[in-house]
Amino acid sequence: MLAASIFRPTLLLCWLAAPWPTQPESLFHSRDRSDLEPSPLRQAKPIADLHAAQRFLSRYGWSGVWAAWGPSPEGPPETPKGAALAEAVRRFQRANALPASGELDAATLAAMNRPRCGVPDMRPPPPSAPPSPPGPPPRARSRRSPRAPLSLSRRGWQPRGYPDGGAAQAFSKRTLSWRLLGEALSSQLSVADQRRIVALAFRMWSEVTPLDFREDLAAPGAAVDIKLGFGRGRHLGCPRAFDGSGQEFAHAWRLGDIHFDDDEHFTPPTSDTGISLLKVAVHEIGHVLGLPHTYRTGSIMQPNYIPQEPAFELDWSDRKAIQKLYGSCEGSFDTAFDWIRKERNQYGEVMVRFSTYFFRNSWYWLYENRNNRTRYGDPIQILTGWPGIPTHNIDAFVHIWTWKRDERYFFQGNQYWRYDSDKDQALTEDEQGKSYPKLISEGFPGIPSPLDTAFYDRRQKLIYFFKESLVFAFDVNRNRVLNSYPKRITEVFPAVIPQNHPFRNIDSAYYSYAYNSIFFFKGNAYWKVVNDKDKQQNSWLPANGLFPKKFISEKWFDVCDVHISTLNM
């Protein structure tokens, strides 16, 4: 961030007058800085007295005085005193689940000394205005809210949101660029590790939002949306100095800048020591995207660093909070299906389990029905998870499951592949030694290709193949199309509400064991097929009728794309 050149003159004088920490240059010889020798770390001064506590409460928004974001031209920042101080302490104590005594006891000071993010927790209330004297009304003031700190540059130098209801701001575009500043790298991790960790942090947000994050090393700095860098004390032209190791470890600014305190001992996510750079980066990116702090247990947006969480993820509330700003992920699927497997429990009994999969382009997601979300870390490349089948644009999946048969097939173009569930790979040949893939016309006579989609109906022991506006019912026992087929999809699967129907070119159709129902997908919408239970409750419903369409994102959550550069993370 190159905002120093446009600081207000008074602020610049305050900055230059402040003591500048002198640090020896961190020595390295390798291009990637893997042999870098970090300079000694500075320690933050503990909060141990009344004055330090007052500064803390003001700095992080707990008092009614805004003094958090850089020196003030009018002199040193005010601090809460007397009754105002006691009330600020009580607010802080309540948020930290401490007895709200209003006294600076040992437990309260300990909470203030915990490592934390530098973004304020609360937006202070506006100062009380004195009564207006009689006379003409005052001239209109600036439209900037009196609650907001002074804007020191085009980037606004203010945090993104507050738990007291202040309006959070969000990016207006969906593709965001980021860059780790080459002049502000960590002295403790290799460049490769830093870039990998930061890219993973962006990916974690991309997995739950329609945002696409891409690393940009070529554009001019001013064109990059989110810039990240490490620094100590006064750093990167920033008006807010870092305090050394032990307290404030990072801060984020509106519209995209994130700074990490290089005096902190940042470590990779696999380490059980230090502060996880991944966890801090995910937190700060949350601020840049518009999320404030919360004291809710389990949230990545808690202001304090929570150790011993090596496998942390964005919880349900964090996901819903960010989706409130950017919306849910929408999109079509090439195919969707439930994968059935047999397992033995602790008593040796055979149990049938299932997992739901969604395929799109060259990626796939496993959907955890019990948690109502995609698996952490998805999507994954089809090439990685399904050896031997086409690596993109799967047309259909069919699982023929009877007392005598347990066969799984993938379809693409004019061919199909059989998949071996036990070996977890596509078969290369059948029992007679004939090679896979095979032509659809040979294995399923009478079925056209390429297909739109297909599914196996266990009730009737039929495969329904869909092609444009037609559906073909295929008898798996006789290996032929039923005599009365093909028929129009609207004839076999009529609309419950007239004209509320996909009509043709269905993207995917599958039977869900989680809902005991058949679903048709087209675009970002789905139609549920009337099942036996529906008919029992409402006998007037047509057999195999389609209920009115709904959005896929309202039933299956967080099936989100990520940038292709992060697919293998």
UniProtKB/Swiss-Prot annotation:
Task: Give any single GO term for biological process.
Answer: collagen catabolic process
Q: Which spans of this chain does UniProt mark as Hemopexin repeats?
A: 330-389, 391-447, 448-496, 503-559
Main subcellular localization, coarse class? Answer: secreted
UniProt-recorded Gene Ontology molecular function terms? metalloendopeptidase activity; zinc ion binding
**Tissues/organs with expression:** Identified in fetal brain, kidney and liver. In adult tissues found primarily in ovary, kidney, liver, lung, placenta, brain and peripheral blood leukocytes. Expressed as well in various cancer cell lines.
GO cellular component annotations of the record: extracellular matrix; extracellular region
Q: Please report any disulfide bonds recorded for this protein chain, giving both cysteine positions.
A: 329-560
Name the residue ranges with Low complexity bias. 147-156
Q: Where is this region: Disordered?
A: 115-166
Where are glycans found on this sequence?
372
What family is this protein classified in?
Belongs to the peptidase M10A family.
Q: What does this protein do?
A: Plays a specialized role in the generation of left-right asymmetry during embryogenesis. May act as a negative regulator of the NOTCH-signaling pathway. Cleaves alpha-1-antitrypsin.
* Protein name, per record: Matrix metalloproteinase-21
Q: Which organism is it from?
A: Homo sapiens
